Amino acid sequence: MGEDTDTRKINHSFLRDHSYVTEADIISTVEFNHTGELLATGDKGGRVVIFQREPESKNAPHSQGEYDVYSTFQSHEPEFDYLKSLEIEEKINKIKWLPQQNAAHSLLSTNDKTIKLWKITERDKRPEGYNLKDEEGKLKDLSTVTSLQVPVLKPMDLMVEVSPRRIFANGHTYHINSISVNSDCETYMSADDLRINLWHLAITDRSFNIVDIKPANMEDLTEVITASEFHPHHCNLFVYSSSKGSLRLCDMRAAALCDKHSKLFEEPEDPSNRSFFSEIISSVSDVKFSHSGRYMLTRDYLTVKVWDLNMEARPIETYQVHDYLRSKLCSLYENDCIFDKFECAWNGSDSVIMTGAYNNFFRMFDRNTKRDVTLEASRESSKPRAVLKPRRVCVGGKRRRDDISVDSLDFTKKILHTAWHPAENIIAIAATNNLYIFQDKVNSDMH
């Protein structure tokens, strides 16, 4: 499918670039909450930064998509496993928001080994006028208390407090690659290379192992778990992907240990395309259920695929993300780029999908019109409120003035982490150590 430069359906403008500096500031995950009012990022330094959407102003109607820093906190610290003599990085692998139950917000964050539940609350009033305590909280001399007064709440500057509520540790031998909150709002699962555990949000010292693909002899190991997610509506269903390119849909009602899947989604390999790199590039790096729950979106190295839950034999749609790299696989293997794990995302109506690429490019595919576009998230190409120009990669021969050659792509600039607002056409793109937020100029055009 060739790229279409007509972007009336996919037309985003740049809102803001939140810029960082050091290695520790490289963004490792991006996640909107269920309303889209909050956006959380995690970085390699173990920090979580939460952005809040600005309320729309009559004086500045363009500010409705603006996100400003709401709170920043240190989620994880570097640790050392003395039993295995291994350092445990503080890098945040995933963040997942819990559905909001009250005025407070809650999120889960995880590094390679430990998952933490955080509560985010606001305070804009403080109590004053205690009878037995002074303003600093110290007990008064009772002889000075001559009258009884009713304490009152006085307004104060807004204060955002983040507090750790639970720490879920010692559940994984291998590195955690994904966490997913169940639709029952009481449980969540965490997956590492070989096992998936089910946790209750209120219980930290016990989890149930629901998938275990570790062979008796590790020499017989042929695949690992790469990602997992709960179904958005059916709390008994979940899917996990593997390094062999397969998806397994499991039903927790069938058995306590879901080693026997309910459905296996796998595309037969085309023998004509078989090469040394076939298995590496077929490894699924991300899997996402559609909001409707009818479809699954997967990302492998060169493509994004849409699967229908009712059809296991092959995907119903396949989109080429950067097929021009097929001839470059040898050099991408040598510089380890072939092992990069790109994420993918649905828009709110499941009609457009998005994923990242190299050179700070990201791709969007409209499932209805079959249009696709390549856009760039970079300071050079993005000025606040400017409309993004579609980019085009040229493989050889004649090229237009704005085209970029495959040989001049920068493989150190990669967009691995993306997120889409659950209801509106606002997207968040993590480009190494910069966060870009884009908003559709013509709202509802893609819906």
UniProtKB/Swiss-Prot annotation:
Q: Which domain of life is it from?
A: Eukaryota
GO MF terms on file?
protein phosphatase regulator activity
SUPFAM superfamilies according to UniProt: WD40 repeat-like (SSF50978)
Alphabetical UniProt keywords: Repeat, WD repeat
Residue windows of the WD repeats: 22-61, 87-128, 171-209, 220-260, 279-317, 334-375, 410-446
| Record GO cellular component, one term | protein phosphatase type 2A complex
Spell out the SMART domains in the cross-references.
WD40 (SM00320)
User: Gene3D superfamilies from the xrefs?
Assistant: YVTN repeat-like/Quinoprotein amine dehydrogenase
- Description of how the protein assembles with itself and partners: PP2A consists of a common heterodimeric core enzyme, composed of a 36 kDa catalytic subunit (subunit C) and a 65 kDa constant regulatory subunit (PR65 or subunit A), that associates with a variety of regulatory subunits. Proteins that associate with the core dimer include three families of regulatory subunits B (the R2/B/PR55/B55, R3/B''/PR72/PR130/PR59 and R5/B'/B56 families), the 48 kDa variable regulatory subunit, viral proteins, and cell signaling molecules. Interacts with IER5.
Q: Which family does it belong to?
A: Belongs to the phosphatase 2A regulatory subunit B family.
What function does this protein fulfil?
A: The B regulatory subunit might modulate substrate selectivity and catalytic activity, and might also direct the localization of the catalytic enzyme to a particular subcellular compartment.
Protein's recorded name? Serine/threonine-protein phosphatase 2A 55 kDa regulatory subunit B gamma isoform
